[in-house]
């Protein structure tokens, strides 16, 4: 088995999943890589936690009770991932003003956290393969660095949302829609 660390940029993946109206069962995703002869030493999962501002902007007719339940559900979901030995990184979703569109939007970016976890892994753990589940082009430089350290890089994401830079630098690409039947939450 090939030792691997897996990094899941859930915020990036969820945007596409929301449009396509399906969900990933992350335990099945890890199982998929295990069946491909990768032994996941650690799995890191990054996702934003809803805030009142973000929740009520998307659900203006919701009640405080519904918000509290949604937040409780998200915390329970993170707990389930932890029970599967995932390292869960979360922070609040923030509202930012987009100068281009002149509208507010919600953002929770984990580029720095994911990069720091990768760097710490390179420095402190013996691993052969890094599996980055994201299509975010901001990780192109990170992947080039890992390749320079003779690491195998797999990028898993959606065909129409993986940045071209990632396609050019990764050793292998896994299109999640191609394995939907194996990883979909049912």
Model-identified regions with their sequence ranges:
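Domain-level signal for Mg2+-assisted phosphodiester chemistry and nucleotide/NA-binding surfaces
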Residues: 1-106, 152-157, 161
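Nuclease catalytic cores that cleave nucleic-acid phosphodiester bonds
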Residues: 79-186
